[in-house]
C-alpha cells in the first residue's frame, strides 16, 4: 500500500479540478449570458443547479465509497464531471447546458467527498491540517484556470478543454486511491438522530452564504478589470487559509476556529458596503473558504471516521441551502434592493450561523462509536 502522503496528494489534485465548477462561474456566467441572451436570474440558475446537485449527490456516493471503497465510485464520478464540461460546451441552448451542468455537478460532488475524506480517514492525528491541505486545491485549481478562461473569452472552448483534461487526469487518478481499514465511527442513521448534526447543518447553511454569494454573484458587485482580478484571486484566497485554520482547529478545537472564520467573513461582507471591495473579498475568501472544512472537522470528531464520507456528505448537503440563499436569494435581494441590501443579507446570515452554534450545549462531545462487527 502506498504511504499515506500519496493519498493526501491525490486528494489535493482531485480538489483542484473540483473547484472548477464553483469558482469559474463568475467568468463563465457572463459569457454564457451574452451567448444565449440570459438575464441575471437565469445566469444564477446554473450555479444553483451545481450547488444543489453536487451536495445532494454526496451522501449516496459517500455511502457507496465507505461500503465498497472509493475507486470505482470515484472513476465513475470523474467521467460524469468531465462530461458535464464537455456537454456544456456542446449544448445548443440553456436547457441542455443546465442538464449537462447538473450531471457534471453530481460527479463533482461525489469526488469532493472522496478527496476530502481521504484526509479524514488517513490523518486522524492531524485532521485539521490534513483536510486543510487537501482543500487548498479547491481554490488553487480555479486560480490557475480563471486567467486562461478570461484569455480565451469563449465559454465553449474553455469548458471543452477542461472536460477533456479531466477525462485524462481524474479517471486514472481515481482508480489509484483507497481508504484504510479498521476504523470506528457512528452510522449515518445514528448521526441523523443526534441534535448536534442538525445544529451543524443549520449553522453551516447560513455561514456559507457570504462565500457562495461572492462565488456566484461577484460580477454583480464589481466589473471590468477588477472583476477579472478578483475572480482569479478569490478561489486562491478560498484555499490559502484552509491549512492555517485547519492547524488552528487542531490546536484550539474546531468550534473556536469556526467562530473566528464566521466573524471575519461577516466583517468582510460589511467592508464591501464601505466600498472596500478588495479588502472584503480577501476577508470572505480567506475565512469563508475555510468554513466548510472546519464544520466537517467538527462532524468527523463527533461521529468518527468510519462513515465519514457518508456523514460528511449528509452535512455537506447544507451547502445546497446555502447555495440557494447565496445565489438565487442573493440575486433576488439584489434585484429588489441593490448591492447594499444583498450584502447586508449575506452578513446577517453569517451572524445567525454563530448564534445557532452558541445555543447548542455540548457540541464538541464525541458520540459513542458503533460496536465493531
UniProtKB/Swiss-Prot annotation:
Superkingdom in the source lineage: Archaea
Pfam families per the record?
MFS_1
Disulfide pairs here are none
Q: Which InterPro entries match?
A: MFS, MFS_dom, MFS_trans_sf, Oxa_For_antiport_fam_transptr, Proton-linked_MCT
An example of a Gene Ontology cellular component annotation for this protein is: membrane
Task: Give TM regions.
Answer: none
- What GO MF annotations does this protein's record show? transmembrane transporter activity
Give the signal peptide as a residue range, or say none if absent.
none
Further information in the entry reads: No homology was detected between this sequence and those flanking other archaebacterial rRNA operons.
Q: Which PANTHER family match?
A: MFS DOMAIN-CONTAINING PROTEIN, MONOCARBOXYLATE TRANSPORTER
**NCBIfam families under this entry?**
2A0111 (TIGR00890)
- The protein in question is named Uncharacterized 38 kDa protein in 23S RNA operon
Species assigned in the record: Thermoproteus tenax
